[in-house]
Amino acid sequence: MARVKRGVTKHQRHKKVLKLAKGFRGAKSKLYRPANEQVMKSLAYAYAHRRDKKGDFRKLWIARINAAARLNGLSYSRMMNGLKIAGVSVNRKMLADLAINDAAAFTELVNVAKAQVSAK
């Protein structure tokens, strides 16, 4: 059986890892082993944080909706309950966008929610 020395294969793998490690500080962008360790950790962080991002944006939208709703005299939870009772199916992303860019439309939605909550 022939001896396999891995010269080209190893070089290509090292080059691929060092390319991914571009921009890292110190040895983590120059030497294969620390670069490989950091690249693996970075990819793990990227994977986890792509999932965290969904919750982070939801929290941001809720904070924005709550702030705008309180300016109109209603808490976030009461507003969402009122909109649900009224059958208004506007998601949090759209509500947060309305709160920032179209205050008049948001105020109308708050009034709809207020009417439903007070009628209950």
From Swiss-Prot:
Xref: PROSITE patterns: RIBOSOMAL_L20 (PS00937)
InterPro entries tied to this protein: Ribosomal_bL20, RIBOSOMAL_L20_CS, Ribosomal_protein_bL20_C
GO function term, MF aspect, one: rRNA binding
Keywords, sorted A to Z: Ribonucleoprotein, Ribosomal protein, RNA-binding, rRNA-binding
UniProt entry tagged with the keyword Lyase: no
Any GO CC annotation of this UniProt entry: ribosome
One annotated GO biological process: translation
HAMAP family: Ribosomal_bL20
Job of this protein: Binds directly to 23S ribosomal RNA and is necessary for the in vitro assembly process of the 50S ribosomal subunit. It is not involved in the protein synthesizing functions of that subunit.
Protein family according to the UniProt entry: Belongs to the bacterial ribosomal protein bL20 family.
Protein name, entry field: Large ribosomal subunit protein bL20
Lineage: Bacteria, Bacillati, Bacillota, Clostridia, Eubacteriales
